[in-house]
Amino acid sequence: MTDTPQVLLAHHLKTLRLPTFLREYDKLARQCAAEGADHVRYLARLAELELIDRERRMVERRIRQARFPAVKSLDSFDFKAIPSLNKMLVLELARCEYIERRENVIALGNSGTGKTHIALGLGLAACQKGLSVGFITAAALVHELMEARDEKRLLRLQRQLAKYQLLIIDELGFVPLSKTGAELLFEVFSQRYERGSIMVTSNLPFDEWTEIFGSERLTGALLDRLTHHVHILEMNGESYRLNQSRKRQKSPKTPA
C-alpha cells in the first residue's frame, strides 16, 4: 500500500529534524490561503517559525547543561536593595562581550546580598547569547576534582571544564580548602587564564583569600591570574534575602 503524501511529508520532516514544520505546516497553509499569501511567503513564515523554535530549544539545552540550581534573570533582581552594586556594569556584562574577550567577573560581598542571583542572571544571559556555561559551587568543584584525581580521570574533567566559555564558581570562601583541594582549584583557574572566562562569587575580600587557599604564594599567583582582566562587583550591604523576605511578609495577602 502506497503511503499518502501526508505520511511521506511527515516522514521526511522528521528525518530532516524539522518538528515545527511538521507541527505548523497545515495550519499555516490554511492561514496563508485565507490571506492570499503566495507560496514564498508561506515558506518564509514556516521557516521563521522553525528558526524561532530551534533557538528556544537550544537555549533550553544550554540552560540544562549549565546545571544552574535555579533559573533567575536580572530582571527579577532588586538593584535598589544593594546600593553598592554598579547596575550599569551588570547590564553591560549581560551583553556578554567580556566572555568574547575572555575576561573575568568577581562578585564580592557579605552573605545574603544576592551574589548568586547576579551570577545566575549573567549565566542565563550568556546561555541566551548562544554561549556555553557551567555553574558549580567551589566546594562541589573541589570535591569533583579530588574524586576525579583518585579515579584517574582528572584530565578528562579538566578538559570538560575547559570547554565552557563561561565557568561560574559560586560560594568561594564558604568552606576552607585542603592543600590538595586548593592546588587542584588553582589548576582550573590557571588553565583558563586568557582562554576562557571565570565568574567567582565570594563572601571574603581579597586580603582574606589566604584563609581559603592556606598559602600566600598560591593565593598571590591565583589572584594575579584572576584579576588581570577582571570586572569586580561590590555587593556589600544588608542581606538581600532578608529584605526580600520582609517585602513578601509586608505585601497584602490575597483572600482565599
Residues covered by each model-derived region:
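Intrinsically disordered, low-complexity and often Lys/Arg-enriched segments
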Residues: M1-H11, R248-A256
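Interdomain "pre-motor" coupling segment immediately N-terminal to P-loop NTPase/helicase cores
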Residues: P19-A70
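Extended interfacial segments that mediate partner engagement and assembly in macromolecular machines
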Residues: R54-L108
